[in-house]
C-alpha cells in the first residue's frame, strides 16, 4: 500500500489525483524512482520569553531567563547515498544517483514515517517521489503537525511563528535496500570520534551578518572545543570525556577546524544525462515559495542562500566545505595538517561535520542536526556562535547525532533541566550531563551492580534492573544505594513491575512503565561532571519515566522527568507511581522512599504496591499497599 493511500484513504487519494490531472501543468505529475539515502533532522531555536507580567507595572518584572528553547521541527530528507571515491578514498555522493535532494516530510508526518518504517539515518532506500507543485498552506500544516505531535507525546510544543519546511517531493513509496548498522552505543570499546568544524562564510550574498565574524577564527574555535588552559570549562572534549566516563573520546589528533569556507550565494549542480523535462526556473524575485522542485533541464539542483534554507542550500554548504577541505590536502598532502586532515576525510565511520553558520543566514532555527549517525558523515549546524552558550548548543546537537531525543518534563518538550538535551539555559559554562535514561540509552551508564563490585567494571548492571520477579516474596527491597551519577557508571535503579523479567521477549502488561531512579550532585569543580547542574537538583533523587531500550531502531520514546526529592511533590520523602491494574501477576505500583542522602550517594527503599489505596488482604503477612504496615498493624485492617 502506498504512503499516500495510508495517509489519506483510497477515496481521498483518487479525488486528489483527479483534481491534479484537471488543473496542474504537465510537469506536476513527474515521478522519480531511484535509490536514495534517508536523513532525519531535528531543529530548535531560542526566543525571548514574554514579560513576567504585562506593562504597565510600577516595579520591574522579576529576573527571568533571557532565552528559552522552542521546538522548531523534525524534517525527513531524501539525499543521494554516499559511496567512497576509489581514487581519493573520500566519501562522495553516488554518481549513479538520480533522486533529487529534497524534503519529503516535516513535523509529525516526518516522525510517523520514520517510526513506521524504522528508518535510521544512512539507510538506503528505493523510493518513488512525485514533485510537489503547489505547497500546502504552511500555517495550517504547521498547526496540524503541532496538534498531532501533542496528541502523540502529551507534550506542549510551544507556539512558534516559523513555518514548517514545505516538502518539495511527495513520498509515494519506499522499500528498504540496505540498513545502516548501529554505531553510537558503547559496547566495551571507547568510541573515538573524528570531527571537522567548518566556519562558513556567505559574504558572497553581500548582506549584513552573512560573513564569518573576524573574531571567529579556527584558532579560537579549536581553543574552545579542546581541553586546554584557555578553553572554557565546558569545552566539547571535556563534555564528551567527563559525561561518558571517557567512553567517548574527542581526541585532538582526530579534530580540525577549517575556514572561513566561502560558498557562492547562488549556484546550481549540473544534471546527469536524462530525458528532457519541461523547464522549471528558480522562483521570480520576491517569491515567498521556498521549496518547489529544484530540478529542471538546466540544473539537477540549485540554491539561493540569500532567500532559502532548504535541503538544497544545506547540500550546497556541505559540498563547499568538503571541497575546501580536500583542496587543503591537495595543496600540501605531506604536511602534518595535510596528513591529519586526509586521515579524517577518509574515515568511513560516523565522521562528525559541525557547521558554524553566519548569524544572518535565512534559517529559522538556532541548531539543527542529523538524528543518529550511521553513514560515513553526519552533520550538525549552529547559526551564529555565542561565547555564552555555544558549547551547550553544539553538545545538544552532537547528542542528536548520537540518537538522543529531547529530555522533557511533563508537557514541556525541553522541560528537563538536568540534561543537555532538555533546558540547558542555566548551565552556564558548566557540564550538564544527560539524565539516567539517556545515559542508559547510549551505553554510558547502567543500573547498579551488586554491592561490593568496584566502579567501572564490565558487569551489566542487571542487579539494579528490577521487575515483578524481584518482588515475589517481599514487596519491599530496602537499603538500596544509588551512587551520585558522576562517581561511577553503574548509578541508577530501573523498576518496571509491569514486566515479568528483563529477558528479551518477556511478558509485559499493557501500559507497563519503567521508572529510572538516579542521584545527582552539583560539582563545584569547574569542568567537573554535572558542574552545570542547578542547585534545584543538587543532592536530589530524580525520577524519570522511559520505555526505550539500547537500540537506535526503537523510536518514539523520550525521557520524562516526573519528580525529585527527598522533598517530592508529596511534600515528603516518598514518591508513588500511578497504579497499573494487575494482569497475570504483572502490574501494580512503585513506591520510593528516600532514607538518606550524602555528598556521594542516596539510600532508598523500594516497594511494589499490589493493592491500590488501602490494604485489602489482611491475613497474608504482606504490606500490600506499601505503607509500612502489615495486615492487622495497618489501620485499613482494623
Curated annotation (Swiss-Prot):
Mediates digestion of the cell walls of the 2 mating type gametes during mating as a necessary prelude to cell fusion. This enzyme acts specifically on the framework proteins (inner wall) of the cell wall, cleaving several model peptides at specific sites. Belongs to the peptidase M11 family. Binds 1 zinc ion per subunit. This is Autolysin. The keyword Transcription does not apply. Present in 2 forms: an inactive V-form in vegetative cells and an active and soluble G-form. The V-form enzyme may be converted to the G-form enzyme during gametic differentiation under nitrogen-starved conditions. The conserved cysteine present in the cysteine-switch motif binds the catalytic zinc ion, thus inhibiting the enzyme. The dissociation of the cysteine from the zinc ion upon the activation-peptide release activates the enzyme. It catalyses: Cleavage of the proline- and hydroxyproline-rich proteins of the Chlamydomonas cell wall. Also cleaves azocasein, gelatin and Leu-Trp-Met-|-Arg-Phe-Ala. The active site is at 397. GO terms for cellular component: extracellular matrix; extracellular region. Residues 270-284 have a biased composition (Pro residues). Glycans are attached at residues 30, 126, 296, 458, 465, 470, 523. Residues 1-28 form the signal peptide. Its EC number is 3.4.24.38. GO terms for molecular function: metalloendopeptidase activity; zinc ion binding. The keyword Protease applies. InterPro entries: Pept_M10A_Zn_BS (IPR021158), Peptidase_M11 (IPR008752), Peptidase_M11_autolysin (IPR016517). A motif (Cysteine switch) lies at residues 95-102. Zn(2+) binds at residues 97, 396, 400, 406. Its cofactor is Zn(2+). Residues 269-292 are annotated as: Disordered. Keywords: Cell wall, Cell wall biogenesis/degradation, Glycoprotein, Hydrolase, Metal-binding, Metalloprotease, Periplasm, Protease, Secreted, Signal, Zinc, Zymogen. Induction: By the signal of flagellar agglutination between gametes of the opposite mating type.
Amino acid at each position: 500500500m502506498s504512503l499516500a493511500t495510508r495517509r489519506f484513504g483510497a477515496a481521498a487519494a483518487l479525488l486528489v489525483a483527479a483534481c491534479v490531472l484537471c488543473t496542474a501543468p504537465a510537469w506536476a505529475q513527474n515521478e522519480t524512482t531511484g535509490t536514495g539515502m534517508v536523513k532525519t533532522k531535528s531543529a530548535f531555536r531560542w526566543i525571548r520569553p514574554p514579560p513576567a507580567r504585562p506593562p504597565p507595572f510600577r516595579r520591574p518584572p522579576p529576573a527571568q531567563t533571557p532565552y528559552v528553547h522552542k521546538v522548531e521541527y523534525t524534517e525527513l530528507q531524501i539525499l543521494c547515498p554516499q559511496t567512497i571515491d576509489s581514487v581519493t578514498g573520500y566519501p562522495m555522493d553516488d554518481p549513479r544517483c538520480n533522486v533529487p535532494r529534497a524534503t519529503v516530510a516535516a513535523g509529525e508526518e516526518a516522525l510517523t514515517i520514520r517510526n513506521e518504517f524504522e528508518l535510521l539515518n544512512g539507510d538506503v532506500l528505493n523510493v518513488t517521489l512525485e514533485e510537489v507543485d503547489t505547497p500546502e498552506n504552511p500555517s495550517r500544516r504547521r498547526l496540524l503537525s503541532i496538534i498531532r505531535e501533542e496528541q502523540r507525546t502529551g507534550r506542549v510544543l510551544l507556539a512558534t511563528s516559523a513555518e514548517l519546511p514545505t516538502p518539495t517531493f511527495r513520498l509515494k513509496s519506499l522499500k528498504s535496500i540496505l540498513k545502516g548498522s548501529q554505531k553510537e552505543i558503547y559496547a566495551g570499546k571507547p568510541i573515538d570520534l573524528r570531527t571537522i568544524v567548518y566556519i562558513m562564510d556567505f559574504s558572497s550574498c553581500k548582506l549584513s551578518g552573512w560573513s564569518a565574524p573576524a573574531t571567529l577564527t579556527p584558532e579560537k574555535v579549536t581553543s574552545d572545543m579542546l581541553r586546554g588552559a584557555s578553553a572554557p570549562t565546558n569545552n566539547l572534549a571535556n563534555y564528551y570525556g567527563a559525561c561518558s566516563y571517557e567512553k567517548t573520546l574527542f581526541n585532538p589528533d582526530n579534530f580540525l577546524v577549517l575556514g572561513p569556507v566561502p560558498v557562492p550565494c547562488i549556484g546550481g549542480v549540473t544534471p546527469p544525462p536524462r530525458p528532457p523535462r519541461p523547464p522549471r526556473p528558480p522562483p521570480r524575485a520576491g517569491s515567498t515559495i521556498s521549496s518547489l522542485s529544484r530540478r529542471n533541464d538546466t540544473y539537477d539542483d540549485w540554491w539561493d542562500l540569500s532567500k532559502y534554507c532548504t535541503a538544497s542550500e544545506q547540500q550546497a554548504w556541505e559540498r563547499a566545505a568538503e571541497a575546501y577541505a580536500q583542496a587543503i590536502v591537495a595543496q600540501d598532502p605531506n604536511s602534518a595538517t595535510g596528513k591529519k586532515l586526509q586521515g579524517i576525510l577518509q574515515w568511513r565511520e560516523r565522521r562528525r561535520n559541525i557547521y558554524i553558520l553566519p548569524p544572518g543566514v535565512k534559517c529559522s532555527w538556532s541548531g539543527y542536526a542529523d538524528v543518529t549517525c550511521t553513514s560515513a558523515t553526519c552533520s550538525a549546524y549552529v547559526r551564529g556562535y555565542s561565547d555564552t552558550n555555544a558549547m551547550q548548543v553544539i553538545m545538544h546537537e552532537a547528542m542528536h547525532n548520537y540518537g538522543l531525543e529531547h529530555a522533557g518534563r511533563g508537557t514541556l518538550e525541553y522541560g528537563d533541566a538536568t540534561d543537555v538535551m532538555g533546558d540547558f539555559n542555566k548551565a552556564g559554562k558548566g557540564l550538564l550531563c544527560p539524565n539516567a535514561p539517556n545515559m542508559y540509552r547510549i551505553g554510558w551508564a547502567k543500573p547498579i551492580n551488586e554491592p561490593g563490585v568496584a566502579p567501572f567494571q564490565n558487569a551489566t548492571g542487571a542487579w539494579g534492573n528490577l521487575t515483578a520477579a524481584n518482588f515475589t516474596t517481599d514487596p519491599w527491597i530496602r537499603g538500596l544505594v544509588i551512587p551520585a551519577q558522576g562517581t561511577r557508571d553503574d548509578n541508577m535503579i530501573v523498576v518496571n513491575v509491569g514486566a515479568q523479567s528483563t529477558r528479551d521477549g518477556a511478558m509485559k502488561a499493557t501500559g507497563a512503565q519503567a521508572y529510572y531512579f538516579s542521584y545527582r550532585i552539583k560539582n563545584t569543580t569547574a569542568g567537573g561532571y554535572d558542574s552545570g547542574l542547578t542547585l534545584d537538583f543538587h543532592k536530589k533523587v530524580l525520577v524519570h519515566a522511559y520505555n526505550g531500550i539500547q537500540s537506535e531502531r526503537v523510536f518514539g520514546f523520550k525521557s520524562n522527568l516526573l519528580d525529585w526529592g527527598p522533598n517530592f511533590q508529596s511534600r515528603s520523602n516518598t514518591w508513588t507511581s500511578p497504579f497499573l491494574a494487575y494482569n497475570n501477576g504483572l502490574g501494580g505500583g512503585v513506591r520510593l522512599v528516600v532514607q538518606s542522602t550524602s555528598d556521594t550517594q542516596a539510600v532508598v527503599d523500594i516497594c511494589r504496591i499490589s493493592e491500590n489505596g488501602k490494604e485489602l488482604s489482611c491475613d497474608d503477612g504482606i504490606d500490600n499497599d506499601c505503607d509500612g504496615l502489615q495486615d492487622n498493624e495497618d489501620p485499613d485492617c482494623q
